[in-house]
Amino acid sequence: MDSEAVYAMAPGADQVMVVGTGCDEDQALLDAASAVLTGDGHRPLASIASNSWQIPLGDVSPQTVHAIDVRAAAEGIGMYVASGDTPGLTVTDSDPYAVAVGGTTLGIGAAKNRVFETGWSDDFGSLAGGKWTDLGVSGGGGGVSDVYRQPSYQKGVVPASMAQVRVANKTVLGRTVPDIAADADPDTGMLIGYTDTDSHGNPGPYRTVSSAGTSLATPLVAGLVADAQQGQKSPYGFINPRLYRLARTGAFHDALPTSTSAPQQDRAAYIAPDDTSTSEDVDVLDAQGRPDTQQVTAKGYDTMTGIGTPNGAAFIAALRRAH
């Protein structure tokens, strides 16, 4: 999915897939990230790294991740990190030297126009035998870090009310996540093509499946930045300060709550019949206000979509002018 998403945005991009090995999954991911920076010993493997993985808070120390991200910034490498597919923060997206990518639900009309776009936060439920079962929320991660204070690039853009966090019995302003967003809702995701094999290793028919999550949003954003970087004299590297300077401009589309961003007929639910049972799954878009998520989609910066979604060619042109 990552590779196809990057190629969809930047067909001419040179891609390098880097994987980690070993029984410790978290360490393997960190090793892969470090390998991108080390490269061949003379230069890094890439100037843009799309990281469609997360490490939960508490699994590794923030200092370990921070050291990698600071080194990347010093070497001119942009670290694009998925904000995760459940509410809250991870140790990887909350680092102030990472470009944290959140998710949206994107409605496209018959004329290929944007009908609506809101923060990805879907409320799942299932109806079977006359009984309604709440299946929880699926959506992009976000929130306020109690480890890192608000970086200078977020000042004046992130509302103080969204950045407040209690640390050592004091209210301070913390690093707020995400920074930017792109389509991540499985209901509005991207078709990924693949060819499966049977039990004997013979190739089967070519298939497509809708795939998404912030693991889709991250390479979509990374691919757009690669488009903007193409032909420039030097790589963009860590671009958060540049992104926040472009907030509230035509470079970004401001994702809004469905109550204001979507036509009435598109607000309620996505209903998908299950062919294998008698149940129906109902997915209510923009499930704000649930007790298990404190995130919101709002005008301007918000904790679901950051400063917004890249506005195509306008985003590319603005990023080049700001370089």
Predicted segments — roles?
Residues 229-303:
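An often Trp-containing, charged/polar helix-loop segment at the C-terminal end
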Residues 178, 218-223:
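Feature representing long, continuous alpha-helical segments
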Residues 1-103, 134, 139, 145-212, ...:
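Substrate-binding/charge-relay-adjacent region of secreted/lumenal peptidase catalytic domains
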Residues 97, 102-171, 176, 254-276, ...:
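Glycine-rich (often Gly-Gly/Gly-Pro-rich) flexible segments and glycine-rich loop motifs
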Residues 222-230:
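Short glycine/serine- and small hydrophobic-enriched flexible loop segments
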Residues 109-111, 188-190, 219:
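Short helix/loop capping segments that flank catalytic or ligand/cofactor-binding pockets
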